[in-house]
Amino acid sequence: MKKALTALCFASMGALLFGLEKPAAPAPVGPAITKVDIRPSKIEFSRWNTPVELTSLEDAKKHFEGDALDQLKAKVDFGNQIVLVFAWRGSGQDKLDYVVMESFPEQIAFSYRPGRTRDLRPHVHVFALRSNVKWRAGGK
């Protein structure tokens, strides 16, 4: 009985020691958001807070062609990322900003600041987000 109890204690201690080893390093995680400086070939202008969400290369082919599509394929991994295309017309001074909130997975809130000039200009912004990131444009 004493030998069985001693063996059980050693087995428990061994499991405890092996369980406290350093964990394997996590896989490298890319940035939550990346600005992509590629202009879509086929732009559908809408409101600033209704971006087009591209989740696959097939979706991207509807908005990008030729060199723009090749550049997008080189910069974005559609297996791990999505693409947001914001396109609207407004004042030349309109600004689109974003804030990355510290949580896991991260949350990104896009905000719009209207310009003060009365000129009508096209605005196009393309962002690549990790697919596990939650995002919202405007609102709360």
Language-model regions: role of each:
Residues 1-4:
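Positively charged n-region of N-terminal signal peptides that target proteins for export
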Residues 7-16:
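Bacterial N-terminal signal peptides
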Residues 20-140:
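Exposed, flexible binding/inhibitory loops of compact, secreted disulfide-stabilized domains
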